Amino acid sequence: MNTNKHVKTYMNSIVFDTAAVQAAAALQPIMETEAAQSAQVPHSSEAALQLMVETEAAQSVSAAPQEVANEILQDAGDTSARVITTTDALQVFSEAVQAIGEVIQETADGPHAIIEVKRAVFDATKMLAQLGTAVVKFYSPLFTAPERIVELVYSISLLVRIMKRIIKNDSLDKLTVDGLDSAATLLADVRSIIGDMFEVFVVNFRYAAPAEYFEAVDEMVHTVTDLALHVVKTVC
């Protein structure tokens, strides 16, 4: 039996209920509230940032797959309610990486150690973008994405947004030398972990049986969310 073909056929058979698209409108009040809360987050406030991350993480778990897909589309500037496509996901990650690069350029005249930490965040975010690209290229080649893949893409998008906030937040400029060393070490670990996840995903998931596939994706969803919390707790 061709396991790879079986998995591809199985996943291509999973489609979103088109009626669920109508639920996208219900996300608008949530997003407006989240935007208002984000605007009120004080710089260098670990508690406020952690609350924001936990709130977003909880929403990513509780939201229906189509709602999650629609929110990713809205992140990409698409207000229409439809199923996420490869192009949509790639646009989200591409714009996130570009925005982070611009922020780093703006802070190029700062202390060297701070630049190194921000560069580490940038490198980690690029790897997240690569992971997200692999997700949508390998497992959403047509028009839809399985439920757990959508949740994984959302979790990656969440961590990218958190890293963007960390880079823009002036809390990095207030870290002590020891704090900078700790942050740089953590972010190097994050890069390593993400790299391992990316390699395992690409090498193993293509040939995984459905049960193993869903178990691994479920673990990765939680791992990415946990990474976001660790980054916020340690760096901010």
Swiss-Prot record:
Domain of life the protein comes from: Viruses
Protein name, per record: OPEP-2 protein
Organism whose genome encodes this protein: Orgyia pseudotsugata multicapsid polyhedrosis virus (OpMNPV)
